[in-house]
Amino acid sequence: MAVKKFRSFDDFVPTISDSEEDVPDLDASDDEMEKKPVKSSKTKNKSKKKAKQQQGSHLDEDVHEDLNPEFQFSIDSGEVTTNFAGWDFQGDEKSDEVEKKDVDLDGIIRRKGGLIMMAATGSDAEESLSEESEEEPEEGDEPGESDDEDELALDGFGMGVKRKATEENEEDEEDEEEEDDDEDDDKKTEMSQADLGKGKDEDEDIEEDTKEEMAEFYAPEEESADAKKIVHKTFNSLSLSRPVLKGLGSLGYTSPSPIQSAAIPIALLGKDIIAGAVTGSGKTAAFMIPIIERLLYKPAHIASTRVVVLTPTRELAIQVADVGKNIGKFVNGLTFGLAVGGLNLRQQEQALKTRPDIVIATPGRFIDHLRNSASFSVDSVEILVIDEADRMLEEGFQEELQEIMSLIPSKRQTLLFSATMNSKIKQLISLSLKKPVRIMIDPPKQAADKLTQEFIRIRKRDHLKPALLYQLIRKLDNTSQKRIVVFVARKETAHKLRIVLGLLGMQVGELHGSLTQEQRLQSVNNFKSLQVPVLICTDLASRGLDIPKIEVVINFDMPKTYEIYLHRVGRTARAGREGRSVTFVGESSQDRSIVRSAIRSVEENAESGKALSRNVDWTQVEQVNSLIGAKGDVVEEIIEEEKQEKEILRAEMELRKGENMLKHKEEISARPRRTWFQSEAEKKNSKMLQVLAKNKKPINSKKRKQQEALAENPRLYKKTQKDRVEYQERQYSKKQAAYGKKGKKGKK
């Protein structure tokens, strides 16, 4: 049949792929030609509608079968992305296991009447009128400032600074406005001024590294000075390869930041670096770009881990991994591994077995994998990066960091980066640095240039802080279109504030250590996508996290140090954008010293933003506080209901765990026991030492010098028992003599 059909065409030459069905039958009538495609479409796709089948011709069907209707031609080269949405916080890929269920706190709040609509405290007209009448700008204000912001009166926070005559007049006006404060409050302010003066002397008395020590430890200053002088306007002048430039272009990076311009050439030379720059200046890319550039010349077909990046928090590690993947996505064969706590351990083991080129990790999970994961080693590590190095050198990470240093090859390049890099040489010696180049782009302990720092004096109104927070968020963002981060000191405070604000109708997320890693990542992603415009978190989120377009940072509780304050406010005003921070300031000397440091930094640097005092309508705040007080019983009910649901989930988890132990007993018992570099007793001791170190008062330079002298030159003569007895007798005779003098005075 096929041969007969092909013979009817004079010019047609059949091939092996041709079939009888593909050849059109020209002898058939037009009716038959119209019916055939309808029949074939019914047999192939029964789900198609009859109207589409009758309208579609044979040519249209061929087009739909051969081309994907969702295919689109890309006119752009794909190298530049202007609308970069930020880094990915998804972590590991989802496993096949059933996800753990969490308590639906928002559902409980809705059942109790929250998250329905915003609580109203008065009309917008009344609010605007009260704000305009109460928050008038003073004489010294700049014309560009808003009505509710005043130039920060330094004496108001205990600052003994010389002021002009006009400023003295302003101070008198402020005193008249604050006549309602009692004398005790004024006395407390004077006491805090004295405390601040003392604190200032102690800060100045802190011993710094001498010039001789710095010259011996660091590389010559000429190297860092030359690196700062050379300004690279584009990444092309840094002599980077095309795959790296293409990756930077896909992220929208056009010109390097000052820290990138200074650090990348030195890092490409293989030298050790200690670098510091303000938050949001691109420090992650400053070490990732030279690392990826050097890995382009790695030996082919030899899988080994050559780079280790250590970070203090899990979220920061996930973000650094995403930065590296985006920069190196056009580099062939470049692999990344993630080793952080809270995520699937088995998945991480499988990924590390492939020996990825770059491993980003937190210290604890990294040591766990080194000791217990097969086929993972760090014998070939060439580069070690410690991000947020000042935090990693503190008490909580010292022992883990020493263990990692003992396992990683000493012949390596070490890169240290942080926004507050003020670690002493004595701390850095343990890292085995080899003449590191010190690159400090900005003055130490400085905030971003376009950051406006605002301060609110709480005085004796600590109980009004939740109401003040609600009123402030409503005023700053009435449409829930801004991202606002609220920092608190305790996890319990973050959780309770979420419930209180939820009952007032505000959608709020929380981020702290009591949440599981899945919950933490979900909170960050919801905040990033503006599903939740307000994120209440502890200092867990104060370092490194780069979420685009965070407009406002609110310090509900004051941090312990000025360095932590800088990291907190550094979540906004990143990468040249404008930002605002609002801080609730108490009457303690610690709070005032942090404010004083912030103001001093603004005064010393002309381009370092503004420091303003924000006035508050406390009558409206008290109205909100009355609403919160009325919902006090509901808050306790929500906490109790959540606790009960958590207990049920925990019982279900224990039940599943017991079933698995019975079902897979042999397999579980056959697994090797996981080990750690510390015993249980050593773990407890280290935790106790950490707690004592946090509560320990800082010693002055005189005592520190005495302790260092004793440590370096211990006593050559050891006391005997006879010496101790004689010493006790002398002390006893002194006490008796002193007691006798007191007795004689009493008789007189």
UniProtKB/Swiss-Prot annotation:
Bias type Basic and acidic residues, positions: 58-67, 720-732
Top-level EC class: hydrolase
Bias (Acidic residues) ranges: 18-32, 124-153, 168-185, 202-211
Single GO MF annotation: RNA helicase activity
GO-annotated cellular components: cytosol; nucleolus
Pfam families given in the database record: DEAD, Helicase_C
Residue numbers binding ATP: 277-284
Main location: nucleus
Reaction(s) the record says it catalyses: ATP + H2O = ADP + phosphate + H(+)
InterPro entries: DEAD/DEAH_box_helicase_dom, DEAD_box_RNA_helicase, Helicase_ATP-bd, Helicase_C-like, P-loop_NTPase, RNA-helicase_DEAD-box_CS, RNA_helicase_DEAD_Q_motif
Locus of motif DEAD box: 387-390
Known EC number: 3.6.4.13
Cystine connections: none
Bilayer-crossing regions: none
Region described as Disordered: spans on this chain: 1-72, 111-211, 687-748
Gene3D superfamilies: P-loop containing nucleotide triphosphate hydrolases (3.40.50.300)
Stretches assigned to coiled coil: 632-667
Domain called Helicase ATP-binding: residue spans: 264-439
Residues of the Helicase C-terminal domain: 468-628
UniProtKB keywords: ATP-binding, Coiled coil, Helicase, Hydrolase, Nucleotide-binding, Nucleus, Ribosome biogenesis, RNA-binding
Biased segments, Basic residues type: 38-52, 694-705
Family annotation (CDD domains): DEADc_DDX27, SF2_C_DEAD
Protein role: ATP-binding RNA helicase involved in ribosome assembly.
Entry domain remark: The Q motif is unique to and characteristic of the DEAD box family of RNA helicases and controls ATP binding and hydrolysis.
Subunit comment: Associates with pre-ribosomal particles.
Name of the protein: ATP-dependent RNA helicase DRS1
Organism phylogeny: Eukaryota, Fungi, Dikarya, Ascomycota, Saccharomycotina
Gene from which this protein is expressed: DRS1
